[in-house]
Amino acid sequence: MQRKLIEIERRYDELTQLLSDPEVIGNQSEWQKYAKAQAGMTDIVEAFREYSEVVKHLEETQGLLEEKLDPEFKEMAELELEELTEKRDELEEKMRILLLPKDPNDDKNVIMEIRAGAGGEEAALFAGDLYRMYTKYAEHQGWRTELLSASYTDIGGFKEIIFLIEGQGAYSKLKFESGVHRVQRVPTTESGGRIHTSTTTVAVLPEAEEVDVAINPNDLRIDIFCSSGPGGQSVNTTQSAVRITHVPTGTVVSCQDEKSQLKNKEKALRVLRARLLERAQEEAMGELASERRSQVGTGDRSERIRTYNFPQGRVTDHRIGLTLHRLDSILLGELDEVINALITTDQAERLKSEA
């Protein structure tokens, strides 16, 4: 590990010099490329430099303890040695995590798709609860959200809702949300007070850039129709809604939320591009993914990942056995404790497989 860290630090210093070179400064695309590469190394280089300082002080303290010291000074040195040893171990663990292969999608924006599953109207209402939970979480993170497409039900739920989350590290934090979310509660339409169980499916896709997925316009069939609102009522007399079919894969995306046909087409293409990227990555990783199923789950949309129990105010993530009795705050977007636990478990599993 030491040799690898020294090499990373050397390259980091090279990039620092390049970024101050007048020729590089004059070439913006080249400067941005180097700046991005250096930014990706900053955390590991800072940790390594701090680690080197700690090791140096540790050796000095160990040397002191080999000398004859008065009892009070010796006690202070022993205490410092203990603290430095603990700090060294923490930094070693941190560096091991930072050296893990990075998911190339981690810095991408996210397209989230939430679909009502079993449970009819109650599942559709819960889809709305999850949509609000994720938009609130995004707000807490300082990210931007944009509605891309929605299919409403008569009582204000969603059969399906698709939205974009833009922000630094959005995919790295939200990727473990893919799967089946189960809700247990008494529906507002239930007169007998019985608890019903409903499900909603969440898919988290990294937003694909045009360079990630090349779409041949000849492979697309584009249909235009009138958009409709809850209950099938027409909300727009002009034909602004767009349905795009990618003929080779049979992937279909519809968008009708904008009054402009052009904007609906742009949004539909963003979703289509993300789905095609996911499809390509799944095909490429299929064999590897089946061999390396981490404790945090498969990311499969059919996997039941979490239960939200309203009568008990409880949220349980089944992949890591985490139960929290603060459902209200979680639905208000306070997801950090859940998401950080999932990330930590994933890192631990990957460290184990790298060992």
From Swiss-Prot:
Classification via Pfam families: PCRF (PF03462), RF-1 (PF00472)
GO molecular function, one term: translation release factor activity, codon specific
SS bond partners: none
Annotated keywords: Cytoplasm, Methylation, Protein biosynthesis
Modified residue annotations for N5-methylglutamine: 233
Post-translation changes: Methylated by PrmC. Methylation increases the termination efficiency of RF1.
UniProt subcellular location: Cytoplasm
Cellular component terms (Gene Ontology): cytoplasm
Xref: Gene3D superfamilies: 3.30.160.20, 3.30.70.1660, 6.10.140.1950
Family that this chain belongs to: Belongs to the prokaryotic/mitochondrial release factor family.
Stated role: Peptide chain release factor 1 directs the termination of translation in response to the peptide chain termination codons UAG and UAA.
PANTHER family assigned: LD18447P (PTHR43804:SF7)
Name this protein carries in UniProt: Peptide chain release factor 1
Organism of this sequence: Desulfitobacterium hafniense (strain DSM 10664 / DCB-2)
